[in-house]
Design a protein with these regions (language model features):
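Long, charge-rich, low-complexity alpha-helical segments
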Residues: 1-10, 341
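Canonical Radical SAM [4Fe-4S] cluster-binding loop centered on the CxxxCxxC motif
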Residues: 9-51
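Local cysteine-cluster metal-coordination motifs and their immediate loop/turn environment
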Residues: 23-33, 296-299, 336-354
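Iron-sulfur (Fe-S) cluster-binding segments and ferredoxin-like electron-carrier domains
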Residues: 33-46, 301, 346-383
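Radical SAM/AdoMet-radical enzyme domain recognition
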Residues: 57-72, 81-219
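Radical SAM enzyme [4Fe-4S]-AdoMet core and its adjacent flexible, acidic
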Residues: 145-153, 160, 164-277, 281, ...
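Membrane-interface junctions of multi-pass transporters
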Residues: 301-344
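Residue-level detector of conserved catalytic or cofactor/ligand-binding positions
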Residues: 385-392
Length: 392
């Protein structure tokens, strides 16, 4: 790889890896990724080969311009790949590190965690993300296995194992039409019962449609689509954030970290947010499927957003392609005038493009479905944010 090819790129190249594609032991009602297996129905086994694993790790490390390299293992359910696979991955990372520091994080539903897994994560300094949607009543509403059985107790068992072995972990919670109505019960569960100090709240918004490729979820390019019943409303989202923020800012700042709150403050002071949905541009976080196909984003795994395959193109060629550049710039360039005139445009930059399927007040396309909720939240926190900025 030529030096001149990659030196202009100041940001780390970042690609999430799907070692088992969309394969999962759960069948959560709202999951946006389960159906992606339909894109690969002609392939009997949706598992990453050792050959591809080595090719990806070598090229991914050698494509970086920074001394730190982050590997993110995502699913499907990542732990459906045996432990030996990840041991092999670490061996390959060491083989090709070339003096770079390698970090690993892995997202899991937690139900398959064992002492052996947790010992491995602790010994190798993995950051483990656990998907859990709050207390049992909230979590089990949508997060069930393929037999329709609830998963809460198995997830809690997994969390307790992580704690037992001293594994660093955080929580990723989907906020839906049900649990959004109980923000304090929701937040206090993570704080008081789990003592989870790093929490990510993700609002679920999906549209259902009939696609020729068999997928039921709408892509951004589809103008039709019926809002899925589990989707949160803008009003719910705004009330949810404001209610939790009021509790958090009085008692928990500096001790419990909520990603969206931290990212909002970052935008307020002119820093890069820690979450892509609130950044000005997209395109910095692609995803690679089990067979080497690379897509523009984890939420845009549709044929129309495929960048290529690692066996036909290099990661640098795909990540810095005209297609990916256009995809990334689209987030800002397609904002309707209502957003550009908004006092809080700097705080959300239109949020995630996948949610921008509404018409603005002037009839322009591209308004975010959650706009009213975000505006309510930003308006609520603005006085405190300004006070924080003015402090010496």
């Amino acid at each position: 790889m030529k030096e001149a090819t990659i030196t202009p790129f100041a940001k780390p190249l970042y690609i999430m890896t799907k070692p088992v594609g969309a394969v999962c032991n759960l069948a959560c009602d709202y999951c946006y990724y389960l159906e992606k297996s339909k894109l690969y129905e002609e392939q009997p086994r949706h598992v990453m080969s050792d050959e591809l694993l080595e090719k990806f790790i070598k090229e991914y490390i050698q494509s970086q311009t920074m001394p730190q390299v982050l590997f993110t293992w995502h699913g499907g359910e990542t732990l459906m790949r045996p432990l030996v696979f990840y041991k092999k991955a670490l061996e390959l990372q060491k083989k090709y590190a070339g003096g770079r520091t390698i970090d690993n994080c892995i997202q899991t539903n937690g139900t398959l965690l064992t002492d052996e897994w947790c010992e491995f994560f602790r010994e190798n300094n993995f950051l483990v993300g656990i998907s859990i949607d709050g207390p049992q009543e909230f979590h089990d509403e949508y997060r069930k296995n393929k037999m329709g059985q609830p998963s809460f107790y198995k997830v809690m068992k997994g969390i307790n194992l992580l704690k037992k072995h001293g594994v660093e972990w955080n929580a990723m919670a989907v906020v839906n039409d049900y649990n959004a109505d109980y923000p304090l019960d929701f937040y206090r569960f993570f704080r008081d019962e789990l003592d989870c100090h790093y929490i990510q709240f993700t609002p679920i918004v999906e549209r259902l449609s009939n696609r020729a490729d068999g997928l039921r979820l709408s892509s951004l390019k589809q103008k039709d689509g019926e809002l899925a019943s589990f989707s949160i409303t803008p009003e719910q989202w705004g009330n949810f954030l404001c209610t939790i923020f009021d509790e958090w800012v009085l008692n928990d700042v500096g001790n419990y970290y909520i990603q969206l709150f931290d990212s909002t403050l970052a935008n307020w002071v002119g820093q890069q947010p820690g979450i892509c949905s609130l950044a000005k541009y997209c395109g910095h976080a692609a995803v690679m499927e089990f067979n080497g196909d690379v897509y523009a984003c984890d939420h845009f795994v549709f044929p129309e957003y495929k960048l290529g395959n690692i066996y036909q193109k290099t990661l640098v060629e795909m990540m810095y392609s005209k297609e990916q550049e256009t995809f990334g710039a689209m987030k800002h360039n397609s904002l309707p005038q209502q957003c550009l005139n908004c006092s809080y445009e700097f705080a959300c930059h239109g949020e995630c493009p996948k949610n921008r399927f509404m018409l603005s007040k002037d009839g322009e396309p591209g308004l975010n479905y959650l706009c009213k909720g975000y505006y309510q939240f930003f308006d609520h926190v603005a006085p405190l944010s300004l006070i924080h900025i003015s402090e010496p």
